[in-house]
Amino acid sequence: MAIKFLNRNIFQRIFGLPATSKPLDPQCSTFSDGKIMIDFKRAPELEKVGGALRLEGDGLPRRVLVVNADDGKFYAFHNRCTHIGHRRLDPVPGTGTVQCCSVNKSTYTYDGSKIYGPPTGPIKTFKVEVAGERLIVFLG
């Protein structure tokens, strides 16, 4: 499998600046009982295939990256590279992978397996479920 790298400049990589933004509407999600509930109507970032958003802070126990993938499914990851520094991840369009925003470009498949870079282990993935106009991410 050939690895595709996101087009990021050296400063973005050195400072670990992710390409994926926080939600335009900070109220698009709620967290309760180990579940994140995302309202699709308030999360336009997830409307298009390849779209993604990062959720962090606001009482969440960990950072989460949510991706609307090319295969028609949604995926959620602990948004933390397993390499030194624990930088954030970004989806790589058309590849079924997410990649660390740092200089090492550690890359993982949607099942969390490492396929490129120095980390020794996988990233944590979370079960997701579409329930009407909501996406539920199970952190437990």
What do these predicted ranges mean?
Residues 2-92, 125-140:
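N-terminal pre-ligand scaffold of iron-sulfur
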Residues 79, 96-99:
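Cys/His-enriched microdomains
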Residues 88-93, 108-112:
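Short Cys/His-rich "knuckle" micro-motifs
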Residues 99-140:
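Short, Lys/Arg-rich amphipathic alpha-helical interaction segments
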